[in-house]
């Protein structure tokens, strides 16, 4: 079976912990992330076979009720997405940069996955709602045309749920901004 990740984002920390427990009991999945995020929300990320992740997310979504911010089941995740969440994927030289900012972690991760599958870009980072008011953003680097395409695809993905905050393409970033965006 294919591997997948599932994400559940809630407005309540207590409800998030309750949902996480129920999700893990409902299906054979691995807990990848369970933590508070700004502003007082709770994030759960699970991994496993597609069917198991779908079952766990369905359980969590049902339990979350009106405290659900967003959810996602992402089968066959691109290999660069999880490293970009954990830290940074390295980029050798200064290139065009694209940034897509969303209102939810799930929307951003889905957008990042679609962008790197549709374009020849490096997914440099995915910053997940810590210290930025609960928003999430992704940074891609590459040739201008590829970055434009990636940002368009990612923006359309986040926009489908009404969760796009803003998008930007910087064709020739200043060296200081480049370092900030790709080195953290």
UniProtKB/Swiss-Prot annotation:
Keyword list, A-Z: 4Fe-4S, Bacterial microcompartment, Iron, Iron-sulfur, Metal-binding, Transport
Cofactor, free-text remark: Seems to be bound by a single Cys residue from each of 4 subunits. 3 ligands are provided by each trimer, the fourth ligand could potentially bind another protein. The cluster is accessible from both sides of the trimer.
Residues annotated as binding [4Fe-4S] cluster: 38
CDD domains in alphabetical order: BMC_PduT_repeat1, BMC_PduT_repeat2
Compartment(s) where it occurs, according to its Swiss-Prot or TrEMBL record: Bacterial microcompartment
Pfam families in alphabetical order: BMC
Biological process according to GO: propanediol catabolic process
Cofactor: [4Fe-4S] cluster
Biotechnological utility: Artificial BMCs can be made in E.coli by expressing pduA-pduB/B'-pduJ-pduK-pduN-pduU-pduT (in this order); pduT and pduU are optional, while pduA, pduB/B', pduJ, pduK and pduN are essential. A construct with the reversed gene order does not make BMCs.
Location (main, coarse): other
GO cellular component: bacterial microcompartment
Secretion signal span: none
GO molecular function, one term: metal ion binding
Pathway where this protein functions: Polyol metabolism; 1,2-propanediol degradation
Domain BMC stretches: 4-86, 96-182
Family the entry assigns: Belongs to the bacterial microcompartments protein family.
Function: A minor shell protein of the bacterial microcompartment (BMC) dedicated to 1,2-propanediol (1,2-PD) degradation. Overexpression of this protein leads to cells with either deposits or having lamina-like structures in the cytoplasm. Not absolutely required to make artificial BMCs. May selectively transport specific metabolites. Expression of a cosmid containing the full 21-gene pdu operon in E.coli allows E.coli to grow on 1,2-propanediol (1,2-PD) with the appearance of bacterial microcompartments (BMC) in its cytoplasm.
Assembly, per entry: Homotrimerizes to form a pseudohexamer with a large central pore, which is probably the binding site for the [4Fe-4S] center. Interacts with PduS. Originally suggested to be a homotetramer; this is incorrect.
Descriptive protein name: Bacterial microcompartment shell protein PduT
Protein's organism: Citrobacter freundii
Gene: pduT
